[in-house]
Amino acid sequence: MAMRLYSFLKDKSIISSDAFIVGNVVDVYYEPGSWTVRSIGVRGSKGLGDVLGASSFRKPQFSLNIGTYDINDVILIPEARDQLQKALVADNGGTEKATVLIGKKVVTSDLITIGTIADIGIDLDTWRINSFKVKIEKGVAEALDVKLGLINKTVSGLLTSHISSVTDGVNLSRRVEDLRGNFTLD
């Protein structure tokens, strides 16, 4: 399982197989019910409009299909410059931007705010969001059995299976005591 945080992917350059700079990652689009990532939002590089036949755009934004990519310092996609049209995804609705989750309050089923979403964990083998980093509220750290550091207040361990709904906040299906011991300090 190749886990990466959204912060690792954000602004990463996307390069075609013939070394053309396609653009940079701006977001990840996921299906709310299944947490499956459907596409990567890209801010296109200068000159990409000509390649895609949309020369009126200076820096087009579009989405790329999910695939098997080599991801290290850059994201290398298998398509060459003249094949980029095949990699594009039309916006068919039904997906949400993952970055909308960052900063949302996390509330337990017993209506206690435990913190805010700080980052998103994505399994790159299955292209599924499966966990979150949470900036913990000072008052609930002890109840969650988390010893916060002086500087670091972010923990890992909130799974998508703990979430009942996402509205103005992230609503959990678990109470505070059910979450005790699930988190590890980053």
Protein language model regions, located:
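Peripheral interaction segments used for macromolecular assembly
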Residues: 1-186
